[in-house]
Structures are given as C-alpha cells and as structure tokens.
UniProtKB/Swiss-Prot annotation:
Biological function: Has bactericidal activity. Active against E.coli ML35 and S.aureus 502A.
Keywords assigned: Antibiotic, Antimicrobial, Defensin, Disulfide bond, Pyrrolidone carboxylic acid, Secreted
Organism: Bos taurus (Bovine)
Major localization class: secreted
Name of the protein described by the UniProt record: Beta-defensin 6
Chain positions with Pyrrolidone carboxylic acid modification: 1
Keyword Secreted assigned: yes
Protein family according to the UniProt entry: Belongs to the beta-defensin family.
GO biological process: cell chemotaxis; defense response to bacterium
Keyword Disulfide bond on entry: yes
GO MF terms held by the record: CCR6 chemokine receptor binding; chemoattractant activity
One GO CC term on file: extracellular space
Intrachain disulfide bonds: 9-38, 16-31, 21-39
SUPFAM superfamilies registered for this protein in UniProt: Defensin-like
Length: 42
C-alpha cells in the first residue's frame, strides 16, 4: 500500500507512532518519513 503521510494513514484507519507498532497492530506505511510508522489493527 502507498501510505506515505499522516493523511493517508488516517484514511486507512491507521495511526502514527514514532516507535514500532504496539501490540496487535501492524505497519501499513509511514507518516513523516522512515522513522514514524503508520500502524493499524489487524
């Protein structure tokens, strides 16, 4: 998927985290470049 900013992340139902995705979530893209990940629940 082409999630590369926080707006697209929100559209896909995700949220931005500066560390790795917590708990039962998976990374679906990035928010503000590489370090900040866009995560979403399974």
């Amino acid at each position: 998927q082409g999630v590369r900013n926080h707006v697209t992340c929100r559209i896909y139902g995700g949220f931005c985290v500066p560390i790795r995705c917590p708990g039962r979530t998976r990374q679906i893209g990035t928010c503000f470049g590489r370090p900040v990940k866009c995560c979403r629940r399974w």
